[in-house]
């Protein structure tokens, strides 16, 4: 159990049979009446965001999430196969479970798999990945009217905006949270 006074961004709670992550919270102490905590909660499974108000000191069950480091070994048909780095057990995840993070998954990459009981909630990628550019238009000297960037497709199939000087075959670092170019490797 966790008190509503201990809510912080990132704390996971169980509410209405689902896992919710606290995105924002505000402790409000009005001049008249009792204090309360206004929160913005995100459903980890569906991504829905709700606003919920709790009385100050109200206790709710804290979700016990298990985070395991696993390595993406290969793709079998539609499924993604991961290997636990400690027990060497394999886990198969569907494209729906992996979500849009699949565009940066590369064989041999280590990721964190977050589980609630036996249910996989999310796949956490590293904050940045290094991938090779496989397709991009050549940068023409003096062509900066478009802001100095162009689209590039990396080895996993993801499209990222890169500076004009990047060419095919170069390895670049990409921020997986914002889908932005960080630099050359």
Swiss-Prot record:
Pfam family, one: EFP_N
Localization per Swiss-Prot or TrEMBL: Cytoplasm
Membrane-spanning residues: none
Pathway, per record: Protein biosynthesis; polypeptide chain elongation
Disulfide-linked positions: none
An annotated GO BP: peptide biosynthetic process
A GO term for molecular function: translation elongation factor activity
GO cellular component: cytoplasm
Keywords: Cytoplasm, Elongation factor, Protein biosynthesis
Record bears the keyword Cell cycle: no
Keyword Cytoplasm on entry: yes
Similarity field: Belongs to the elongation factor P family.
NCBIfam families: efp, PRK00529.1
Function: Involved in peptide bond synthesis. Stimulates efficient translation and peptide-bond synthesis on native or reconstituted 70S ribosomes in vitro. Probably functions indirectly by altering the affinity of the ribosome for aminoacyl-tRNA, thus increasing their reactivity as acceptors for peptidyl transferase.
Protein name: Elongation factor P
Organism listed in the record: Thermosynechococcus vestitus (strain NIES-2133 / IAM M-273 / BP-1)
High-level lineage: Bacteria, Bacillati, Cyanobacteriota, Cyanophyceae, Acaryochloridales
Gene name per UniProt: efp
């Amino acid at each position: 159990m966790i008190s509503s006074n201990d809510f912080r961004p990132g704390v996971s709670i169980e509410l209405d049979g689902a896992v919710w992550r606290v995105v924002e919270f505000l402790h409000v102490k009005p001049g008249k009446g009792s204090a309360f905590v206004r929160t913005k909660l995100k459903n980890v499974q569906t991504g829905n965001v709700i606003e919920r108000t709790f009385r100050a000191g109200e206790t709710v069950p804290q979700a016990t999430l298990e985070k395991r480091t696993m390595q993406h070994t290969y793709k079998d048909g539609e499924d993604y196969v991961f290997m636990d780095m400690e027990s060497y057990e394999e886990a198969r995840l569907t494209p729906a479970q992996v979500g849009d993070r699949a565009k940066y998954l590369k064989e041999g990459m280590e990721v964190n798999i977050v589980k609630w009981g036996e249910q996989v909630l999310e796949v956490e990628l590293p904050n940045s990945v290094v991938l090779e550019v496989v397709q991009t238009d050549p940068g023409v000297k003096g062509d900066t009217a478009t802001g100095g960037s162009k689209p590039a497709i990396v080895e996993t199939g993801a499209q990222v905006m890169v500076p004009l000087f990047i060419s095919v075959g170069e390895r670049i670092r990409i921020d997986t949270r914002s889908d932005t170019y960080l630099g050359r490797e």
